[in-house]
Amino acid sequence: MIKLIATDIDGTLVADGTLDLNPEYYDVIKELKRRGTIVLAASGRQRASIEKVFTPVLDDISFISENGTCIHSKDYQYVDVIDPEIVRTYIEEARQFPGCEIAINKDNMTYMAVSYTHLTLPTN
């Protein structure tokens, strides 16, 4: 019996950066769960983006998001948190490089310096 099937999302199940999953996969995921097989989708994406891809089967699938730092399923969530002092050190070091842009991801959120207005979406 197959106990676990793990797959990448971007470039494997969907075209890079899209939400276009073949609807037939939803039935496959449900059938695998019925048979007792865990389906695990992994991505560097944030959780909200992955949830949009798998909305019809969120109760039937587990996923790894944020480049491996978060694991989610219907009944479980694990988030690996980096010590804030280490983050501060990395930010200070990165600021030494001209043109280096810093984005810090937290489960379902990205923090960017206010000076990076060229990277933000318009508000109107």
What are these regions (language model features)?
Residues K3-D16:
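Asp-based phosphoryl-transfer active-site loop
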Residues G17, T123-N124:
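A very general structural signal that marks isolated residues within well-ordered alpha-helical segments
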Residues D10-T12, G68, P122:
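Anionic group-transfer/hydrolysis microenvironments
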